[in-house]
């Protein structure tokens, strides 16, 4: 059994940090030590910011985004084309698409993908909210931007089937060769998807 070398408060900090995605036990220890060394400049402001976020952050009742207002900043932005909705798995995907800056449209966060093996069904996701948004009218296109996994494909098909008959165009992201990618380094699935999604030049 390993000897304890720190007090319970530091151990608790390490254990909580280890629960953050991307941080394992070793990275959590490093992060904790860094925070402790920078108590005044970093730990105090971080604790304050986390407290404020805990008190103020809400889940948008319209799209599922996280913000301090409900409806969120994206849903209330009149400069966005609200007739187009990009459907994503998680808020991190919404943020990634916003960083790309390709389109100024609305979003809908599902909160995951259908996965019967993991016990995740349609009622566990924000799919009904999407169907309700479309049924209200004013939406002309749904862009499904879920990951190219089995669960993502299943979710995309489920959504497409349930939007049929609502008079909305349903598209999905093209999958294929990344910008700057070399064909020799791509897997067969990516190459096949790129060939199917080919475009005129």
From Swiss-Prot:
Pfam families, alphabetized: RecR_C (PF21175), RecR_HhH (PF21176), Toprim_4 (PF13662)
PROSITE patterns, per the entry: RECR, TOPRIM
GO molecular function, one term: zinc ion binding
InterPro entries in the record: DNA_Rcmb_RecR, Rcmb_RecR, Rcmb_RecR_Znf, TOPRIM_dom, TOPRIM_RecR
Assigned keywords, A-Z: DNA damage, DNA recombination, DNA repair, Metal-binding, Zinc, Zinc-finger
Single biological process term from Gene Ontology: DNA recombination
CDD domains, alphabetized: TOPRIM_recR
Annotated Toprim domain residues: 83-178
Coiled coil: none
Zinc finger C4-type: from-to: 60-75
HAMAP family assigned to the protein according to its UniProt record, in alphabetical order: RecR
Annotated family: Belongs to the RecR family.
UniProt function note: May play a role in DNA repair. It seems to be involved in an RecBC-independent recombinational process of DNA repair. It may act with RecF and RecO.
NCBIfam families, per the entry: recR (TIGR00615)
Entries under PANTHER family matching the protein: RECOMBINATION PROTEIN RECR
Name of this chain's protein: Recombination protein RecR
Species the sequence originates in: Allorhizobium ampelinum (strain ATCC BAA-846 / DSM 112012 / S4)
């Amino acid at each position: 059994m390993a000897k304890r070398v720190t007090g319970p408060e530091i151990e608790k900090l390490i254990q909580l940090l280890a629960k953050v995605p991307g941080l394992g036990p070793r990275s959590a220890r490093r992060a904790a030590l860094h925070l402790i060394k920078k108590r005044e400049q970093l730990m105090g402001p971080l604790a304050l910011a986390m407290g404020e976020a805990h008190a103020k952050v809400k889940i948008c009742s319209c799209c599922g985004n996280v913000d301090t207002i409900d409806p969120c900043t994206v849903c209330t932005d009149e400069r966005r084309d609200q007739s187009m909705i990009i459907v994503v798995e998680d808020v991190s995907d919404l943020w990634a698409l916003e960083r790309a800056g390709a389109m100024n449209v609305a979003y809908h966060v599902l909160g995951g993908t259908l996965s019967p093996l993991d016990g995740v069904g349609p009622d566990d996701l924000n799919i009904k909210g999407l169907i309700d948004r479309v049924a209200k009218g004013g939406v002309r296109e749904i862009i499904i931007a879920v990951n190219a996994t089995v669960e993502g494909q299943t979710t995309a098909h489920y959504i497409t089937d349930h939007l049929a008959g609502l008079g909305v165009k349903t598209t999905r992201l093209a999958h294929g060769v990344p910008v700057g990618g070399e064909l020799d380094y791509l897997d067969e699935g990516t190459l096949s998807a790129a060939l199917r999604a080919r475009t005129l030049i």
